[in-house]
């Protein structure tokens, strides 16, 4: 039997584009599960649903994404296995060096890195990610850096996919 130690619902509204996200998060002794729906009303708009399963250290075990936009349904399954990352069941050796996953349309992925970042100002974490474009569900290797500026501010720096993009993220005690 798994004990549920924390269960919450979080809403995010995008500031850069028109859209919102509803995320249900459950934390148990065995790990974390995040299920979410993202709605984007930019352009033709789209809906993205995901089911993200994490281990007790907040590292991705699996991530299933379902995208609906312009009358087209897309699906993507990412799995961490003992032999490496699988994308829709196929091993991707080009992703062997990555630490975790980043979806372009959700701030939740920042939480995974921030929870592993040190608590002291100046603490820094740089690692590879599988970057998933929310519109196309394409997946590529990328690199990111997180720098703790203060207890509640973390600087995000993209080092590959959106090279040069930086943002200060205001965070609570949960990341």
Where does each model-flagged region fall?
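Solvent-exposed helix/loop surface patches that form functional interfaces
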Residues: 2-22, 75-162
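N-terminal ordered "arm"
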Residues: 4-49
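Hydrophobic/aromatic beta-strand elements that line small-molecule binding cavities or substrate pockets
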Residues: 22-25, 49-53, 144, 167-169
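Generic beta-strand structural signal
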Residues: 27, 54, 80, 149, ...
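A short, structured loop/turn motif at beta-sheet edges
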Residues: 27-29, 54-59, 120
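A generic structural motif
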Residues: 37-41, 66-68, 157-159
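Hydrophobic/aromatic-rich structural module bridging two neighboring secondary-structure elements via a short loop
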Residues: 42-90
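Gly/Pro-enriched, hydrophobic low-complexity segments
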Residues: 51-53, 155-175
């Amino acid at each position: 039997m798994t004990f549920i130690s924390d269960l919450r619902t979080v809403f995010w509204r995008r500031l850069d584009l028109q859209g919102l996200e509803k995320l249900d998060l459950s934390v148990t002794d065995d790990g974390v599960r995040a299920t979410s729906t993202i709605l984007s009303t930019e352009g033709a708009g789209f809906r993205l649903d995901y089911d993200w399963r994490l281990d007790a250290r907040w590292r991705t075990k699996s991530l299933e994404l379902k995208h609906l936009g312009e009358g087209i349904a897309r699906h993507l399954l990412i799995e961490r296995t003992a032999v490496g990352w699988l994308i829709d069941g196929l091993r991707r050796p080009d992703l062997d060096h990555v630490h975790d996953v980043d979806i372009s349309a959700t701030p939740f992925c920042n939480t995974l890195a921030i929870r592993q970042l040190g608590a002291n100002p100046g603490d820094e974490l740089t690692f590879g990610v599988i970057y998933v474009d929310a519109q196309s569900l394409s997946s590529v290797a990328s690199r990111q850096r997180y720098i703790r500026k203060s207890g509640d501010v973390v600087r995000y720096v993209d080092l590959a996919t959106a090279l040069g993009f930086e943002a200060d993220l205001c965070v609570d005690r949960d990341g």
